[in-house]
């Protein structure tokens, strides 16, 4: 019922095994990665390196829930190179960014091709709302998903809506057509007026309401923990995750 996924920062855990060890310490079965690990693009890694990584995933009992692709989605050769190694590692989803496009429709055309490539490997393609991007509001996300077609899922990041002084639950989620399309809920909270992050439940991002309604709708995605404060220590991460789990217990 509760899938906890963490994206360990390079500041806290620079190496792949260190990231898996951090997952162990905080009790998360799912790990999120960038497509660049210790300076090397995942799609460029050789078979021996990928096999070693796969062995570590088995040893630690972890699953890669998400890989963030940092390249351009129009570069399908690079994207497909990432897909091949991601598939071998058992990754469940890849997130792409839609920067560099003038319209959502233009981004959707390239995203659609990436989504079909990913589908061939049994991998979901994900997009995430970001307050400083083309996909700032829920209607932008809806348009991209509708235009790009199947195998495109969303990552709902409430703090980005809070930074725009929009209520993530009442303004963005409640009337959304993407309620059943959410693959990840970012566990993030922040304050409208100061535009700064806060612990879950202490800001205006309505994280408790979002988690509650998703669970009531049989949410099968991941609650995703990220270093949204910036350079969080191990103690900070513990406090952050504990705060959210406390909210869950209060529901």
Task: Outline where the language-model segments fall.
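Charged helix-capping and loop-helix junction motifs
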Residues: 45-52, 77-82, 106-112, 138-142, ...
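N-terminal pre-domain/capping segments
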Residues: 1-93, 123, 180, 241-251
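H/E-rich (His + Asp/Glu) clusters that bind or coordinate divalent metals
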Residues: 203-210, 217, 222-223
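Acidic/histidine-rich catalytic cores of soluble enzymes
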Residues: 4, 116-204
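Active-site acidic/histidine proton-transfer and metal-coordination neighborhood
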Residues: 17-18, 56-63, 71-154, 163
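Active-site beta-loop-alpha junctions enriched in small/polar residues
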Residues: 7-11, 34-38, 67-72, 98-101, ...
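Substrate-binding clefts and catalytic carboxylate motifs of secreted carbohydrate-active enzymes
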Residues: 233
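Well-formed, non-transmembrane alpha-helical positions, independent of function
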Residues: 22, 85, 143, 173-177, ...
């Amino acid at each position: 019922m509760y899938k906890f996924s963490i994206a360990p920062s390079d500041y806290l855990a620079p190496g792949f095994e260190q990231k898996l060890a951090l997952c162990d310490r905080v009790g998360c079965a799912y790990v999120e990665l960038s497509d660049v690990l210790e300076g090397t693009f995942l799609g460029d890694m050789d078979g021996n390196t990928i096999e070693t990584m796969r062995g570590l995933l088995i040893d630690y009992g972890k699953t890669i829930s998400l890989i963030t692709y940092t390249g351009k989605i129009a570069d399908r050769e690079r994207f497909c190179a990432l897909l091949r190694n991601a598939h071998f590692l058992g990754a469940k989803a890849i997130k792409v960014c839609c920067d560099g496009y003038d319209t959502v429709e233009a981004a959707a055309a390239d995203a659609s091709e990436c989504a079909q490539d990913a589908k061939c490997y049994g991998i979901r393609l994900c997009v995430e709302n970001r307050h400083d991007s083309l996909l700032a509001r829920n209607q932008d996300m809806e348009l991209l998903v509708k235009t790009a077609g199947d195998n495109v899922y969303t990552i709902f990041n409430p703090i980005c809506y809070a930074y725009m002084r929009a209520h993530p639950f009442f303004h963005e989620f409640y009337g959304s057509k993407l309620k059943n399309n959410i693959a990840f809920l970012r566990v993030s909270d922040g304050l409208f007026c100061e535009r700064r992050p806060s612990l879950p439940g202490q800001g205006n991002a309505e994280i408790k309401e979002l988690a509650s309604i998703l669970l009531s709708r049989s949410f099968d995605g991941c609650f995703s923990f990220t270093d949204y404060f910036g350079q969080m220590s191990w103690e900070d991460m513990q406090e952050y995750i504990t705060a959210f789990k406390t909210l869950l217990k209060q529901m």
